Amino acid sequence: MSGDPENPGQPERAAVAAFADDFLVGLREWLAIPSIGADPAHHGDVAASAHWLADALRRDGWPDVRVWDEGPALPAVYACWPAADPEAPTVLVYGHHDVQPVDPVEQWHHPPFEATVIGEELVGRGASDDKGQVAMHLLGVRAHLAATGAAQPSVTVKLFVEGEEESGSPYLTRLLDEHRDDLACDLVVFTDTPLYGRDAPTVCTGQRGVYGAEVVFTGGRSDVHSGRAGGSVPNPATAIARLVAALHDEDGRVQLRDFYADVTEPTAAERADYAALPFDEAEWLANAGGAQGLAGEPGWSTLERVWVRPTAEVNGIEGGYTGPGLKTIVPARASVKLSFRLVPDQRPERVADALREFVARHTPAGLHAEVIARGDGVPPYAVDVSHPAVEAVRDAVQAAFDQPVRFSRTGGSGPAALLHGWLGVPVVYLGATLPDDRIHAPDERVVVPLLLRGAEAAARLWRLLPERLS
């Protein structure tokens, strides 16, 4: 292919444009499958989604396509397209095809599984998270082959699309163990990541981890009349309030012992990139649930607080009587649910130990304390920004978007650290969605031209990697 006449030397762009209409038709078909992994009533749809993807891969010419549907995990899809050069690097593209529930469905302006086109946007559950981005990478492979005129890609491309990410990937470790040989690679490309903004393209280099737990204080066997025992027995609700108050100091720093001991701070170059990104406080607050003002750890910008600083958040408090009117009691039980966002090189198990120690220090005599972990937690991950694969992704995105690209991170969590740990290779990020795509919410959408630019970047990346990783 000779390339786009308006963009000489960019054959990937011309190839993406040639496939764009077909891409949109296929993506809409896939989005019509309600693959809600968290709902057992839709597990058949998750299987249908996996088989739809497998069929699409075969139509595209992938020579090795499999649906992994044995065992307890919901169906995952694996595919491999070997490079012509057996010495070329092997790259594993990771994504997921399960989607979030659609509740509250009455707040959708369009049916969540009809994939409605509105101007440049495609509205539907999974459009952004993550079917749209997986489809983007499939288009990238097609465009790469068309642009190079080759029958095989410049790198061996493997695809691993799981069906349980939105449920916390409970069987991902098992899949990685059982299929270790199939998934062996030199690099992982993580699809489930956004740009910073439509006019501020970025390359993500890491995401925070998370650990969650519930702390329960118990006093007597039952609630007791406050006139009978108030002031003479410890109050679990008061103790929970004091525990919560002690969780942070006046500057918002978390007071668990050695909480910051393992924190690795971003480089000066990364912080400079974050500072160079456009930031509108009013717009940011509006997208943060309509918050009324900023707060947080001194010495760090809002973006840094969200991306590269650890946090402790109170998710909910329960105890005593909260119904209409007044009930004069000393409650027998009170609890608080906490979540901790973690950054490299914090570990969920160390935070769990620190939380238990903190609770023990703040448990009054006469109360029983229990710390209930909500899962094992998810470790954080960050890739070295000087790694040649990261530089290749940045160059590919910069060429596709025709403007400077900066590094970013994301405040959420995902299985990047797990993939890195099991496969023993770096994880880089290449996505083209937006933070305001309303993922997990009504009217989830994706901006189609951004997906096309992302596909162009992916197509170019496959061409760059053999030289960069040599």
Region locations from a protein language model:
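N-terminal helical capping/dimerization or prosegment-like subdomains
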Residues: 2-105, 333, 337, 350
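Structural signal for hydrophobic packing residues in well-ordered secondary-structure cores
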Residues: 20, 31, 57, 61, ...
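An extended, acidic, His-containing surface patch that forms the Zn2+-binding/catalytic region
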Residues: 86, 197, 255-333, 344-357, ...
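Active-site metal-coordination/substrate-binding segment of hydrolases
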Residues: 88-158, 453
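Acidic-glycine-rich active-site phosphate/pyrophosphate-binding loop
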Residues: 105-117, 208-219, 395
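Fold-level recognition of mixed alpha/beta catalytic cores in primary-metabolism enzymes, strongest
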Residues: 127-294, 303-310, 421, 443-451
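A generic structural motif
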Residues: 128, 221, 340-348
